């Protein structure tokens, strides 16, 4: 059971076309989506998460067609977090994370739900902040609260669009370690858009590189972490050197 | 040691009420509003009744005032609940059904009726059939208008608002055009219908209006948990498995039913719902629609009865109630808009 994309295409206009993309994202483990700005990473991710209509092609998650299956059923196996989030409702961190249980509880939180909520909050080190309102948090703290909501949803497949946005070094590393743990210990499949190629190489099992709306490379970090490959993908001179913890891309 | 673990577990809960203080505040405000509502109701019923207390004429006057109060209650429920649900669906706490062209829709329907049928036909148009027909026309047209506006065709809220206002303007000129071709007596009949008036509301519609409102409010009440999620915006709601487009159509149809009912009773009101909803968000401070709806309704009812009491019993200008409430509501709207500085 995995995520499969078959001839998936999105035409924003005559000039901007994303796809066609045909690929399979393995289940279990972390897959990083990388590529320059405007490559189509968010487009592909939100289409997998059925937040954006597909023009042509099909996407299945765990064998279910994301467009034709009931949204209710998909919400129990797949969760997705977008790049930008904004709410008119005034919510505390805990209330927000509590909404992650909606697919299971339909709004009536049980003691079991509260347990998942507490776990997700603790998992992202938000325990002390759980009763704060979102508008009283820093950008990075808020970003972690959004991720906690998605984790509380407790789905096999988790799609995250740049969750490291706004995070400092410590929290970025912590979040990647936690996502790694969720994949290793809980068997989750995590698809994550990352901008830092070194993070992608170190924490993911597979890297899916996109450019100009197409998938240009899909392989293990070792296969992607090559001078020519990275230089080609990112349109900028990249040198890969041996670091203390594996290959390191130097691009500055 | 187990005891501490237990108490922290108990404190960690996620409901719409954050803590004891919040709970106390909510209950206190609801109690004050409830007391005000009861007091004003009693005041309106008994104040300055010229007949001898307890006599037959006295009861007759009380009965007439009771009808006005029931109308006020129905109108308050309609506008308060409809506005909260509408603002949740459009994910914006400034826009209201009235601002998005509902009043113009009503005017155009009424004008068309008089225009096509003339005085005789239009005055004959009273009773259940025409009432339901007029409701149906409003509900269908408004649902189409709102779902079209919300279909995601308009990339941002400003364009959506602009389109809503322009449609209102176009419908307005259409009505104006037809009104110019009416005879003076036809025009009289029409004006009487267009201006909201609680003192001589169409109380004969109440037996149909009340069941409609009760059913619609019950339907929204059962959807409250879904509404809470929809308030988080399209993508979050979709992620959580809400069939967003279908829910929007349902909510818009229910909202249209409520506003159409209130409009059929007392004419268009643009800002009553805004006033009630804004106060409920401010004082309720919660995402839960099951807590917001009752508070908004009580605010709406209290504001309307208070204006009715003052205008009718003190200034002797009962006909101006809706006008005054709209004036206050419009001012509050401007203040909120200026303070927020954005839509
Ligand atoms: N709603 C839209 N309408 C028109 N074009 C769009 C829309 N959304 C995205 N695009 C275009 O599609 C292309 C891909 O956008 P996408 O958001 O998927 O890029 P991305 O890889 O996520 O980039 P980034 O790293 O900047 O987040 C871009 O050229 C963008 O301008
Ligand atoms: Mg993006």
Residue ranges, per PLM feature:
Chain A
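Helix-to-loop junction immediately C-terminal to a conserved catalytic motif
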Residues: 49
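ABC ATPase nucleotide-binding domains
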Residues: 233-252
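Conserved ABC ATPase signature
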Residues: 133-137, 141
């Amino acid at each position: 059971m995995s995520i499969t994309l078959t001839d998936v295409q999105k035409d924003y206009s005559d000039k901007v076309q994303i796809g066609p993309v045909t690929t399979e994202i393995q289940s279990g483990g972390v897959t990083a989506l990388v590529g320059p700005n405007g490559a189509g990473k968010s487009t592909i991710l939100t289409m997998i998460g059925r937040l954006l209509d597909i023009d042509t092609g099909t996407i299945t998650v765990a064998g279910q067609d994301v467009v034709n299956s009931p949204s209710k059923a998909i919400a129990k196996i797949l969760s997705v977090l977008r790049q930008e989030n904004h709410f008119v409702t005034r919510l505390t961190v805990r209330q927000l994370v509590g909404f992650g249980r909606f697919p299971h509880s339909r709004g009536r939180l049980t003691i079991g739900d509260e347990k998942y909520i507490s776990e997700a909050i603790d998992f992202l080190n938000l325990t002390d902040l759980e009763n704060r309102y979102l508008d009283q948090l820093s950008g990075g703290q808020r970003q972690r609260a959004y991720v906690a909501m998605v984790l509380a949803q407790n789905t096999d497949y988790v799609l995250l669009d740049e969750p490291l946005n706004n995070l400092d070094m410590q929290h970025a590393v912590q979040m990647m370690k936690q996502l790694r743990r969720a994949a290793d210990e809980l068997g989750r499949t995590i698809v994550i858009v990352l901008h830092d190629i070194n993070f992608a190489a170190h924490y993911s099992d597979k890297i899916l590189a996109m450019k100009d709306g197409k998938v240009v490379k899909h392989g293990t970090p070792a296969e992607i972490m090559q001078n020519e490959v990275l230089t080609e993908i990112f349109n900028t001179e990249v040198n890969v050197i041996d670091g203390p913890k594996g290959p390191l891309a130097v691009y500055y | 040691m187990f005891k501490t673990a237990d108490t922290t577990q108990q404190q960690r809960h996620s409901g719409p009420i954050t803590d004891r203080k919040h709970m106390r505040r909510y209950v206190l405000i609801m109690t004050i509003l409830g007391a005000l509502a009861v007091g004003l109701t009693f005041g309106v019923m008994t104040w300055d009744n010229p007949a001898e207390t307890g006599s037959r004429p006295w009861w007759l006057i009380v009965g007439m005032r009771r009808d006005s109060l029931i109308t006020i209650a129905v109108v308050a429920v309609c506008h308060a609940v409809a506005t909260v649900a509408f603002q949740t669906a459009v994910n914006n706490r400034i826009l209201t059904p009235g601002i998005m062209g509902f009043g113009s829709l009503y005017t155009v329907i009424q004008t068309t009726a008089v225009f096509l049928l003339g005085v005789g036909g239009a005055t004959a148009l009273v009773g259940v059939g025409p009432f339901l027909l007029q409701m149906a026309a409003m509900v269908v047209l408004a649902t189409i208008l709102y779902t079209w506006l919300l279909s995601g065709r308009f990339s941002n809220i400003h364009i959506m608002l602009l389109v809503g206002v322009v449609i209102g303007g176009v419908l307005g000129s259409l009505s104006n055009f037809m009104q110019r071709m009416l005879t003076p007596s036809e025009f009289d009949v029409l004006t009487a219908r267009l201006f909201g008036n609680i003192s001589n509301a169409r109380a004969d519609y109440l037996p149909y209006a009340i069941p409609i409102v009760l059913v619609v409010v019950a339907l929204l009440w059962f959807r409250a948990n879904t509404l809470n999620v929809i308030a988080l915006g399209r993508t979050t709601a979709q992620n959580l498995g809400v069939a967003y487009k279908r829910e929007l159509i349902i909510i818009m149809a229910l909202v249209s039913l409520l506003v159409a009912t209130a409009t059929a009773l007392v004419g268009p009101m643009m800002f009553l719902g805004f006033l009630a909803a804004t106060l409920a968000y401010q004082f309720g401070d919660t995402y839960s629609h099951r807590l917001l709806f009752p508070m908004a309704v009580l605010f709406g009812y209290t504001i309307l009865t208070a204006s009715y009491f003052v205008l009718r019993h003190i200034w002797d200008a009962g006909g101006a109630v809706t006008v005054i409430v709209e004036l206050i509501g419009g001012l509050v709207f401007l203040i909120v808009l200026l303070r927020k500085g954005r839509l």
